[in-house]
Amino acid sequence: MKTFYTLAGILSLSEDEKELIKQQALEGDPVACYKLAEIYLYLHKCEDYVSSAHELLQKASEGGVADADASIAIMMFRGEIEPFDPVAAAKRLEKAINNGSDRGIAFQLRNLLYGRYGYKQNTDLVKQTLDQLLSQDEDPYWCALMGDFLMAEGKIVESQQWYEKAVAGGENSVYGDLALARGLNDDYSFRDYEAYNDTLMEGNDAMDPMCMYYFILDKIESYYDIDPEDTQARDEYRQMIIHALELNTEWCHPMTMELLGDIYREGQIDVPVDPVKAWGYYVHGSEFMHASCFGKMYDMLQTDEIQLGQMSNEEAMDLCMINGARLHDARLLVATVEAYKHGRLTQFAREIEMFHIPAYDAIPDDEPLDEEDEGPDDDGRFDAWA
């Protein structure tokens, strides 16, 4: 079942395997309903994938699949299920955990580790819980989470042993983390660049899209080392970067979508500025509930870099704000509350009054509210790379 907790696991499924799961789900098998829902949520390959996944998860939950309750709770926390109600989401998550959902336990541990979705950070409880789980069985899933814990604590070198165990057990989604652990010192300086790069290539073969993302970030820096007079070399290198990123978007990686948006919005690597393409990539990333994509869409609308035909820029900004607030983006949370105070977003009045205004009031006066203030969309892995 843990195959369906990670993008890398789902990407590795063959078309025949996915078709079999779909057939079993149509026949009413609750586990297959859960699996098919996760495929829809990760890959967005069916029309109206959110409502289709929700319906399948409800069937799986009724059939006793605890992980389905965890997935529903996650959708509720992210604002994919209306009305937005994080209190109800927390209760649904508690139900999943009480029924033995590994997915629910892992989600809760990450919330406590990174202080996400309104949970107060509690690394002591995370460590205690992981020690208990690993004393029973060194499951690769929990090994990966222990690696995440150590990485978040700044113990990059120590995290390597746990990521090694996770990968050895088939947890392919942590190759990007393993590359960092093999290559970096605790102060983020390189101790073995070759091991780092080799692991990225290994992880790319194992379908961890984070590996290609890290690899291309490195190549973007290298682009500027090419002699500007050598236009052919720069053209070929640029084409390689764009092609690799486009392939990675097919692996449903929202950080890659955001990066492509940045390239076209800012004209990086000598790409002609194209706000329409930039907007398209940010929209694609936002479909995966990637908070910073909502922030960049908001910025483009605010500065009139893009004009939408279907709705006014102000209406679109409202949608960006409320989604960002739901995802605990501090800057968009502030924008949401300020806009509401000026008579906008009234259709979300209950939600804003109950949840966003209290969160707004709790923000310290001296807290920075720029884009760097967002929560860790990649569980802190980009910070470790940087």
Question: Where in the sequence are the language-model features?
Answer:
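TPR-repeat structural position
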Residues: 14, 50, 86, 123, ...
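Single-residue signature of alpha-solenoid repeat helices
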Residues: 17, 53, 89, 126, ...
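Short helix-capping/linker turns of helical repeat alpha-solenoids
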Residues: 27-29, 42-44, 63-66, 78-80, ...
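Hydrophobic face of amphipathic alpha-helices that form TPR/SEL1-like repeat modules
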Residues: 35-42, 71-78, 108-114, 148-152, ...
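Residue-level detector of the short coil/turn that links helix A to helix B
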Residues: 44, 48, 84, 121, ...
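TPR/TPR-like (Sel1-like) alpha-helical repeat modules
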Residues: 166-168, 276-287, 312-329
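Terminal, low-structured helical/coil segments at or just beyond the last alpha-helical repeat
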Residues: 320-386
